[in-house]
């Protein structure tokens, strides 16, 4: 990276089970450090299936804050179910980071649950049902705010067999990529985007 290029923060966001880690692996694995609490939990205790989520979450926050203080590019994963990810995006932007958002949405909390159950069968981590039910609508509710903070955004739907890119925002230019806009997308994305293309 040359001296004029700002560091980059990639934010991979979406409800539990939506496919955030898979999207990161498809887009950037090996290109940029990925601070992911689920992977940290697995590193702490591989045999437990990553059950030490609280400790892993604290370590993830420490790692990403340290990287921002050193102005290193990084990527994070978040459900956007709380305000901490938005605050971190604002903090990074205020220190000169370029913020890129990649959001993966899915239709329902029930689909989240089904995807999580598949992941558990394959040895991945579980998420409590009450958290799944709470985080799905909370994530969608914060999507528009995350897009307003980000310098560029990609919004995907992963409700079907294949992930579809729905919307891209780059340099203030909004491009609708797919004419089929699922109900979750219409409800979550700020109406100001509808009239920008």
Task: Place the predicted regions along the sequence by residue.
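Conserved substrate/cofactor phosphate-moiety recognition/catalytic segment
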Residues: 23-72
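Conserved nucleotide-binding/hydrolysis micro-motifs of P-loop NTPases
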Residues: 39-41, 81, 105-111, 160-162
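NTP-dependent small-molecule kinase module
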Residues: 145-197
């Amino acid at each position: 990276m040359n001296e004029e290029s700002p560091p980059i923060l990639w934010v991979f966001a979406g409800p539990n089970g939506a496919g955030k880690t898979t999207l990161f692996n498809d887009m950037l694995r090996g290109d940029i450090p990925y601070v992911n609490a689920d992977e940290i939990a697995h590193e702490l205790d591989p045999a437990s299936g990553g059950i030490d989520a609280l400790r892993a979450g604290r370590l993830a926050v420490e790692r990403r804050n340290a990287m921002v203080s050193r102005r290193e590019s990084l990527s994070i994963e978040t459900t956007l179910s709380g305000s901490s990810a938005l605050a971190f995006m604002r903090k990074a932007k205020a220190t000169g980071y370029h913020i890129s958002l990649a959001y993966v949405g899915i239709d329902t909390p029930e689909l989240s649950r089904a995807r999580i159950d598949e992941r558990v069968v394959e040895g991945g981590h579980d998420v409590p049902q009450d958290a799944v039910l709470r985080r799905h609508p909370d994530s969608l509710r914060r999507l528009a705010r995350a897009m307003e903070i980000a310098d560029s955004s990609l919004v995907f739907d992963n409700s079907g067999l294949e992930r579809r890119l729905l919307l891209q925002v780059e340099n203030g230019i909004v491009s609708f990529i797919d004419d089929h806009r699922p109900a979750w997308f219409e409800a979550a994305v700020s109406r100001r985007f509808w009239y920008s293309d």
